[in-house]
Each structure stands twice: as structure tokens, then as C-alpha cells.
């Protein structure tokens, strides 16, 4: 692992801790309780994709939350910069995490294949 990869992983780890703290400091009740599942920085650390837990939000609520997060993005960046003493913070791109649903779907398919194989 080269030094740039280590810096990227360190940044991801720090952001995974700081973003929930920053969200908790906001006045918006919808944003305070969001759960950050993962943070993925792109090469160069100019952009960070922040994956959020869907919990029990419907599509309309998700769109509303993403819109609010886009507006609050600069405040979140300022919080991260002030906490870490950074002169620059990655641009945040928020997404709801579909990986768990995808994994559950794949597991169900494999179980079905296994069951069909045993019946044959």
C-alpha cells in the first residue's frame, strides 16, 4: 500500500467519524439522526461519497433528505475543516446505501438455486 492510499484511507476514516458529529450539530431534525454507513474518497481526495443508511425512509423522504444535505454540505465541510485543522475538505456527495438490499437479494437467489439443486 503506497502513501497516497494510506492518506486516502485515513481521510475516509476521519470523515466517517466527523460527518455524524457534524450532522448532530445541525438544526434540522431529519438530518440529526442519519446513520453514515461508509465514506469513499476518490483519488486525490477532492470528492467524498457519503453512503447513508436508508432506515425506514420512503423515496420522497430520501429525496427531501438528500436535498437538505446538499444545502448543508458547506456547513458540514466547514465543521470537518475546523475540527481537523484542514485547509481543504472534500466535496461531499450523499447517497443512500443500496448495497445491503443488493446483498440480501443475491443471498436469496443463491438460496433458491441451492434449494432447486437439492430438489433435483
From Swiss-Prot:
GO terms for cellular component: cytoplasm. One of its GO terms (biological process) is maturation of SSU-rRNA. Keywords: Cytoplasm, Ribosome biogenesis. InterPro entries: KH_dom-like_a/b (IPR015946), RbfA (IPR000238), RbfA_dom_sf (IPR023799), Ribosome-bd_factorA_CS (IPR020053). It is found in: Cytoplasm. Its main location: cytoplasm. Pfam families: RBFA. Monomer. Binds 30S ribosomal subunits, but not 50S ribosomal subunits or 70S ribosomes. Belongs to the RbfA family. HAMAP family: RbfA. One of several proteins that assist in the late maturation steps of the functional core of the 30S ribosomal subunit. Associates with free 30S ribosomal subunits (but not with 30S subunits that are part of 70S ribosomes or polysomes). Required for efficient processing of 16S rRNA. May interact with the 5'-terminal helix region of 16S rRNA. This is Ribosome-binding factor A. It comes from Campylobacter jejuni subsp. jejuni serotype O:2 (strain ATCC 700819 / NCTC 11168). The lineage of its organism: Bacteria, Pseudomonadati, Campylobacterota, Epsilonproteobacteria, Campylobacterales.
Amino acid at each position: 500500500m503506497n502513501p497516497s492510499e494510506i492518506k486516502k484511507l485515513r481521510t475516509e476514516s476521519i470523515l466517517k467519524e466527523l460527518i455524524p458529529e457534524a450532522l448532530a450539530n445541525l438544526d434540522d431534525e431529519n438530518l440529526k439522526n442519519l446513520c453514515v454507513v461508509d465514506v469513499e474518497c476518490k483519488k486525490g481526495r477532492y470528492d467524498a461519497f457519503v453512503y447513508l443508511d436508508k432506515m425506514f425512509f420512503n423515496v420522497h423522504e430520501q429525496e427531501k433528505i438528500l436535498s437538505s444535505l446538499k444545502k448543508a454540505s458547506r456547513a458540514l465541510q466547514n465543521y470537518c475543516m475546523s475540527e481537523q485543522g484542514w485547509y481543504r475538505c472534500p466535496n461531499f456527495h450523499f447517497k443512500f446505501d443500496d448495497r445491503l438490499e443488493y446483498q440480501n437479494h443475491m443471498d436469496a437467489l443463491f438460496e433458491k438455486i441451492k434449494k432447486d439443486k437439492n430438489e433435483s
